[in-house]
């Protein structure tokens, strides 16, 4: 029985020259020479580069099948690994047998025909776009980053916690949530006041898709000390931008007995760890992004790893922006939420390095962030990266029950709705901190792909839930 190998193993020299091997994949291109040879570029997704298979016209199905192969056909090719005289790859396959597993029905109308497609067009055929160079490379980088995140936390002694996707609480207090209901929309039950009676719904109360796993994560951090969540989150924001998705993935660590300084250190260590991993493990894909998408991809990651994070208080950051002499689209004053242009000025022009901005005004931050002694600011932080702006947002959590209750009431929230969250402060409360990393934002940063819809397999956005 001939050994079956992935193309990456053949190209990386794990199969000896002269060994017979079978590869399975899809045709990227076929070209024929007058000398009675066909050159098949075959990919299987295991790496960026295809392998070249040389097929002689003495193969039994050469005329009937090999010469009919087009982009997208699936093949099983058995042959001998030989040194390649061609530039760009060390080895190729001298084919002895070509079996066609699947034909492309009509090559003329095949949506992934061998030509340059716009990234916008690829979104319309999201079920086929993984076959392209760019989306295949994004998928491998996404996998590498996810594995590196899990590895980092495991090595640091964190436990992964699966927080629920269905919830009754709004972590952000923003109200932009997707409702989960089995009620008959044609015949909604009403209470005495005419409002929808959610007590008759599946969960017996109003329920939503989660906007964050943080609150649930805190409960486990207050028992296991160090945890993280990594899963999908949902926002019903009507935002049609290159930066927003209705469904996206979040990485949310939570640490007991931790301060804002511990939080910032964890964020720095994690980002540098995953960037080192992707530079090491996905060189082939990053070289493609560097050549075709963003020339600075590799140098940006290397600079990030080699930079010490700057730290600045929000109040001082506002002063830096006011003194910059720059005319910003959004005016700068104490109390504003920093916009992307402000964040990028700080990271790219002022500090020329990643920067942690901390201690934000309480009025622009969430109820669970720890109130500072000045009574005006909270122990919040944002990590700003050159080239994108905010990449991580986090805070030290409010561990004092009386202060937490007061903040909730100030923000129009009912403390009773958060009774279980408040219990953490009643029974052995502890200073703790955590942050959120939008996973797709991270992939955008690493690949240079500008639209967030192109770094998630099936993007969900306003009026778009195809596939």
UniProtKB/Swiss-Prot annotation:
Its subcellular locations are: Cytoplasm
What is this protein called in UniProt?
A: Asparagine--tRNA ligase
**SUPFAM superfamilies assigned to the protein according to its UniProt record, in alphabetical order:** Class II aaRS and biotin synthetases, Nucleic acid-binding proteins
Which GO terms fall under biological process for this protein?
asparaginyl-tRNA aminoacylation
Protein family according to the UniProt entry: Belongs to the class-II aminoacyl-tRNA synthetase family.
The EC number on file is: 6.1.1.22
The record's Gene Ontology cellular component field reads: cytoplasm
Q: Which domain of life is it from?
A: Bacteria
Give one GO term, molecular function aspect.
ATP binding
* Xref: PROSITE patterns: AA_TRNA_LIGASE_II
This protein's assembly is summarised as:
Homodimer.
Which keywords accompany this UniProt record?
Aminoacyl-tRNA synthetase, ATP-binding, Cytoplasm, Ligase, Nucleotide-binding, Protein biosynthesis
- Substrates-to-products reaction catalysed: tRNA(Asn) + L-asparagine + ATP = L-asparaginyl-tRNA(Asn) + AMP + diphosphate + H(+)
């Amino acid at each position: 029985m001939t050994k079956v190998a992935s193309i990456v193993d053949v190209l990386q020299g794990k199969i000896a020259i002269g060994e017979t091997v079978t590869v399975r994949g899809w045709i990227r291109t076929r070209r024929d020479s007058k000398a009675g040879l066909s050159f098949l570029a075959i990919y299987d997704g295991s790496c960026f580069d295809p392998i070249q298979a040389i097929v002689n016209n003495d193969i039994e199905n050469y005329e009937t099948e090999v010469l009919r192969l087009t982009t997208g056909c699936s093949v099983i090719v058995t042959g001998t690994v030989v040194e390649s005289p061609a530039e760009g790859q060390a080895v190729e396959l001298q084919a002895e047998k070509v079996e066609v597993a699947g034909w492309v029905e009509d090559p003329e109308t095949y949506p992934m025909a061998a030509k340059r497609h716009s990234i916008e067009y690829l979104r319309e055929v999201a079920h086929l776009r993984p076959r392209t160079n760019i989306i295949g490379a994004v998928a491998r980088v996404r996998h590498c980053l996810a594995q590196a995140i899990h590895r980092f936390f495991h090595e640091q002694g964190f436990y992964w916690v699966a927080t629920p996707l269905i919830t009754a609480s709004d972590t952000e207090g923003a109200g932009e949530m997707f409702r989960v209901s089995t009620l008959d929309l044609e015949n909604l039950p009403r209470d005495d006041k005419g409002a929808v009676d959610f007590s008759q719904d599946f969960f017996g109360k109003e329920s939503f898709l989660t906007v964050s796993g943080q609150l649930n994560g805190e409960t486990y951090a207050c028992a296991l000390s160090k945890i993280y969540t990594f899963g999908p989150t949902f926002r019903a924001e009507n935002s049609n931008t290159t930066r927003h998705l209705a469904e996206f993935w979040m990485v949310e660590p939570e640490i007991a007995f931790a301060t804002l300084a511990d939080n910032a250190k964890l964020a720095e260590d994690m980002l540098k760890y995953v960037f080192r991993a992707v530079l090491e493990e996905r060189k082939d894909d990053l070289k493609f992004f560097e050549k075709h998408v963003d020339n600075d991809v590799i140098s940006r990651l290397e600079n990030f790893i080699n930079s010490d994070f700057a730290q600045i208080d929000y109040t001082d950051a506002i002063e830096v922006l006011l003194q910059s002499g720059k005319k910003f689209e959004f005016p700068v004053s104490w109390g504003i939420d920093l916009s992307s242009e402000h964040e990028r000025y700080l990271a790219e022009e002022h500090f020329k390095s990643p920067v942690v901005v901390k201690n934000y005004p309480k009025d622009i931050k969430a109820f669970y962030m720890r109130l500072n002694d000045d009574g005006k600011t909270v122990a919040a932080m944002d990590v700003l990266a050159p080239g994108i702006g905010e990449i991580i947002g986090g805070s030290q959590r409010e561990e004092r029950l009386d202060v937490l209750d007061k903040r909730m009431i100030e923000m129009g929230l009912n403390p009773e709705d958060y009774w279980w969250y408040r219990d953490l402060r009643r029974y052995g409360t502890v200073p703790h901190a955590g942050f959120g990393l939008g996973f797709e934002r991270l992939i955008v940063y690493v690949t240079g792909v500008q639209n967030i819809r192109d770094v998630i397999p099936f993007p969900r956005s306003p009026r778009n839930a195809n596939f």
